[in-house]
Amino acid sequence: MRYYQKLVSLLVLVLAASFGVGGCVLLYSDFAVQRGRMATANAAAHAQTCTLLQTEILDLQRRGTTMDDAALTARVEARDTPAALWRGDTLICATLPGLENFSLENAATVTVRTEESVYAVYASDLQGGLRLVTAYDLTGLYRDRDAALTRFLLLEAAVLAAAAAVT
């Protein structure tokens, strides 16, 4: 192999590596921005769900309706959001399998990965010793990130293969 071919090969390799690292950094920074936006939106949705449920409970109590576990379960199940309701350490209801395992503290936020899905789980205390735990599906966000990274790496491999064929 001639000197200029070695030099060109080395240059292509260095450029490919730098573009590869730069592309991955861009993909992950974009993912971080999207994840932050989702976290903000999910936190707002959780706060709204807490406010609406608390308002319903207070309204029913004001009318003299007793809020037993069945009434609370009906209120939680009426929501479109997967949720679990706790009274102290006692689970009242859970609308998503697995949420009964998350007796989180007030204002806690965790990201949970199951075999098939990724969820952002939020917890907040309500009046009367109740704690509402809600879950928001992030599976699509993580799936899109993985697909973009796969496409990028395949493109990077194709560029390296083309460069190898040319040199």
Where are these regions (language model features)?
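Extracytoplasmic/periplasmic helical hairpin
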Residues: T49-L99
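Membrane-proximal, non-catalytic sensory/regulatory domains of signal-transducing membrane proteins
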Residues: L96-R131
